[in-house]
Amino acid sequence: DRDWHADGDSGYITMSWKAASGAASHGVYIGTDSAKVEKATTSSPEYKGSQTGTTYKLVNPSVHKTWWWRIDEKDASGRVVPGKLWAFERRRLAFPDAEGYGRYAHGGRGGKVVYVKNLNDAGAGSLREAVENSIGPRTIVFEVGGIITLKSRLTINDSRITYAGQTAPGKGIVIRGCSFGTAGMKDGIIRFNKVRVGYTGNTWDGTGLTGADFSIMDHVSQSWAIDEGFSSRGGKNLTLQRTMIAEQLNVANHQNYPAGTAHGYAATIGGDVGSFHHNLLAHNEGRNWSLGGGLDAAGYYAGRLDIFNNVVYNWGGRATDGGAHEVNFVGNYYKEGAATTQHTTLNAQLEGTGKG
């Protein structure tokens, strides 16, 4: 129930259910109006017939609709037990060139359009109002371009949001001063954004998809974070694509290290599952990438990552390290630069399937 990414790529969706004890036949009801499906009778257009099997194939369901269905079961004596109402939506690409495990993110489709009308940190017409005002699914578009200086962290917690940075006029939007990311967002689309945190005295990250599910970040440019440029710890069904993560501040009083310690971290990537492709990591001291699969609730190695067709340039003392349970690592290009002191780009140190 509530599968919002049902696979109808072959032109149909097969629904299945488990028969109740004593059920002799199953009445199938399906449509795009929940109230009509819930109240439908055998004379309603939503009624698709009675059958003994426990699967039903819906041919060419619209990708623009939510489909509702129920199964009424009849026993040998003719007694009918009405079924519960179930729902699904057919999956489709977030946008034409979306790839990877987050490619079916809904974003704000079918919801409201919210306009960012100024570059203020908060208040009416601000980006913060558009993000934090929980009004349901929405697409955030921009009537202004320029620099938004945040006074506190800006986090997307809601689901079904599209951040359409490509709508900003001129050179687009730059977010500076604090982190801009997610915490538990589902079905989110973030595109064409620039994040330049800068030195503020706080150990800010740059951006990320922390805790997100069925979400995608595309054409983002991120630099000058204190901790790390990007993080996706705890995420599921993610894509980071066609993004630049560069020039993290390297000796900038990171709160977890003694003064003068180099940090300048590019990205810690987690996900179950996550895709990271066609990205550029440049001029970062470390974590290019750091695989943050971690451990699951039972203590076993976690994280399934596809990492392909990325470029890593001019890292410092750390290239790619960390750990994950399953990794596809294909077609990535590493080029040393003037800052490079570690000349091993990737070292597969341990293959384990048990607990960490």
Where are the regions that the model predicts?
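Acidic Gly/Asp/Thr-rich repetitive segments characteristic of extracellular carbohydrate-active
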Residues: 95-140
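Hydrophobic loop/turn residues within beta-sheet-rich immunoglobulin-like superfamily modules
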Residues: 20, 61-63, 178
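Recognizes extended acidic, P/S/T-rich segments that occur
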Residues: 27-64, 76-84
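Right-handed parallel beta-helix
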Residues: 160, 164-165, 169, 186-197, ...
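Extracellular beta-strand-rich solenoid/capping regions of secreted or surface-exposed proteins
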Residues: 9-10, 22, 128-136, 147-164, ...
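Pro/Thr/Ser/Gly-rich low-complexity, intrinsically disordered linker/stalk tracts
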Residues: 1-21, 86-92
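Hydrophobic beta-strand segments within extracellular beta-sandwich modules
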Residues: 69-70
